Regions:
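Short, acidic loop-to-helix structural element flanking the phosphoryl-transfer center
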Residues: 2, 78-106, 110-116
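Helix-loop "lid/cap" segments that line or gate small-molecule binding pockets
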Residues: 28, 49-62, 118, 152, ...
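A short acidic, helix-capping loop that chelates divalent metal ions and anchors anionic groups
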Residues: 53, 76, 80, 115, ...
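Substrate-recognition "cap/lid" segment bordering the active-site pocket of phosphatases
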Residues: 112-192, 198, 202-206
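Structural recognition of alpha->loop->beta junctions
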Residues: 123-133, 223-243
């Protein structure tokens, strides 16, 4: 039986957004006096909160981070947002899940207005019951950092009606990959969070829902394994099989 409530990350999970994001980061760095000709080196910016990436990768302070994000938006909001494509098979997956009655949500660190623009641009907004992204103040809040995704997942779960504390599971190893029968011990495990980075898996774990990683995005299989993914899909087709086979 399929998961009845499924949260998706956006960048690197539903859409191949790397080109637009990396070029916009490159532009922002140039404006800050930093030259980075190799776009591949900027791919780690896809997924994590921007403030965290600029701080950790370029040692920027709070004021510099705010300026870098401003320059990033100058490029991304008008051009980079459209240098993007839906991964092959994603439309069909969303249609299938929608038709079988699963409720779908977006939990993204991207600013919420941008999330809506991307989904509407590709004509897939209608599949989602709940769409959650960050607010400007959250994106700029240097104290938020990696906790941003945890909050987005929590908000999306609340939008789907899941509130309160998780029930205790009898088996402490209930999150191990390959143990679908144990996932049924906790109602929250009928909810899945799908993403391509450790931040997505951490967001799922912190909110006690099933963590489903996808290795076709911008994070490696190793990153997902180390973050404790319950399941990992190497293709969109495999993701579909996981989401329709292991839900409670």
């Amino acid at each position: 039986m399929a998961f009845q409530n499924i949260l998706f990350d956006l960048d690197g999970t539903l859409t191949e957004s790397g080109p637009g994001i990396t070029r916009s980061v490159q532009y922002a760095l140039h404006q800050m006096g930093i030259e980075e000709p190799d776009l591949q080196k900027l791919e780690p910016f896809v997924g994590p909160p921007l403030n965290l990436s600029f701080r950790e990768r370029y040692g920027m302070n709070e004021e510099e981070t705010g300026r870098a994000i401003h320059y990033f938006r100058e490029s991304y909001d008008t051009k980079g947002i459209y240098e993007n494509n839906v991964y092959p098979g994603v439309r069909e997956l969303l249609q299938m899940l929608h038709e079988q009655g699963s409720r779908l949500a977006i939990a993204s660190s991207k600013p919420e207005p941008m999330v809506h623009r991307v989904l509407e641009h590709f004509g897939i907004a209608g599949y989602f019951d709940v769409i959650v992204g960050s607010h400007v103040e959250e994106e700029l809040d240097n104290k938020m950092g990696a906790d941003n995704k945890l909050l987005m997942v929590k908000k999306a779960l609340q939008g789907l009606g899941l509130t309160g504390e998780p029930e205790a599971a009898e088996d402490p190893e209930h999150v191990m990959t390959g143990r679908p029968e144990a996932l049924r011990q906790d109602r929250r495990k009928s909810y899945a969070m799908v993403g391509d980075r450790s931040f997505d898996m951490n967001g799922a774990k912190a909110n006690h829902v099933t963590a489903v990683g996808v290795s076709y995005g911008y994070g490696s299989r190793r990153e997902l394994e180390e973050a404790g993914a319950d399941f990992i899909a190497d293709t969109v087709e495999e993701l579909g099989r996981i989401l329709t086979a292991y839900g409670d």
